[in-house]
Amino acid sequence: MKSKIYFKFTTEKDEIDGVYKDGLNIYKTSNTITNISSDNKKEGITYLDPSKSARCLYRDAKYLRIVRLHKDTVSVKQDYLNDNGRFWADKLYLGKRFELSDPFTIMYMIKMGYNVRERDDYMLEWACAGNFTEVARYLLKIGANPGTNKYACFESAVRNGNYDMVKLLLENIPGSDKFYYKMLEVFKNKSRYCGPEISKLFFNYVRDCDIDYIIRHDTQKLYVLEDTEFVKSLVGRGLGIGKFIDRTEPKFDKYYLECVVRGFLDTMKYFDTIDTTIVTRNQQQLIEKAVLSKNLDVFKYLEQNIDVGPMIDDLILKCMKIDLFVFVKYMIEKYNVINVLDTNKLIENISLCCNMEMIEYMTNLTGISIPETQGLLTNACQYNNSELVKYLLEKGANVNEFNGKPLREAIKNNNKDIIKNLMDYSPDISLDNYAAIRESFATFPEIAKKLAVGISIEKLHEIIFDQKIS
């Protein structure tokens, strides 16, 4: 065995051209290396010259394998045009396997001639993409530049949601305007990958005058408002008075509204302490957003300073539409308005519900019967709510509403339980429900047959194939 050491990078499965084992690896036959394959490329097991191997590091590489050649190994350079230190061999020995995520491995590679700064510090970008934080830390200590490769290091760290990596890179950035504005661009464009903690890191790095510009760029940044202490620090740095802010707009109204939407009650209370008039502006919008937040505690808090009475009818109906039973029950019991609600609107909104608790509560309270509603059963079938379908049928829901649409929806969803309930509870199910016959013919022929009782074979052919028998 020849004594010179070579390298080989392999993936997590320890393979790239094939599956490898410790010790001697032989590629097919010994004469393959001298032949030309069908795609006009030579074949063999790839190995690398350590001093040039940086040119061959690839994104998915996870291990470094130590390679030694057999004494009668036949090998050729893989690419004569690019001197990248890559060779093919018909046989070679694979020795120790090292984790590329270990800084010790990187030190060993450097000792053997590997150039970590090659390809514009590609190894740092590779470490950031692979979440190898300790390797990145070591590379930065020995001079790697996080701004190379078009700042791909930052983009990879942010995309991976790697808090420690982002923090490390921010601690090692050059102090130039060019780099600063590139970081703002990364922060804006990759914000969907930033959780609140990574966003806070960037905000600590952002200049005070840019805080409002960044935080208003998209809704992802607004989740930092949940941390009241962090918001206090932003207010201390000038939140609400930065660049690109309309000076006629109250400083904190937008942020307060976003806290309502997201249910950040503690931060709302903090804003109220520094601007006692904030809740008096846009009252209806604040209440409507509190409903959409589905946070009853936020609604109750706003209610202390906002007269909800004039809006209560619309709010109850809106909550019914979006199945907010907790809100509906709270408002009805507190404001005692059930007798003044429009009965037709109530029936319409009950018909849109798919919440059994809400339906039961409202029908019992108002005296509206299930048969009076139109659409409840169809909605329940559409949303595959078997329990609600059974309840509605027991209460007398019309299985033929909308020309038998409940059955069509159940067939479309392939829900055998609902189909069985519809058929069992309604012996008078419409026999001219052609859409249901068509949709059930291939999947539930027994249902199609039952629905087709009394229909001539010629008419049935026309229904199924949409074509008359000539």
Curated annotation (Swiss-Prot):
Record's protein name: Putative ankyrin repeat protein L279
Superkingdom in the source lineage: Viruses
Alphabetized Gene3D superfamilies for the sequence: Ankyrin repeat-containing domain
ANK repeat feature ranges: 119-148, 149-178, 372-401, 403-431
Keyword set, alphabetical order: ANK repeat, Repeat
Disulfide bridge positions per record: none
InterPro entries the record matches: Ank_repeat_dom-contain_49, Ankyrin_rpt, Ankyrin_rpt-contain_sf
A Pfam family that the UniProt record links to this protein: Ank_2
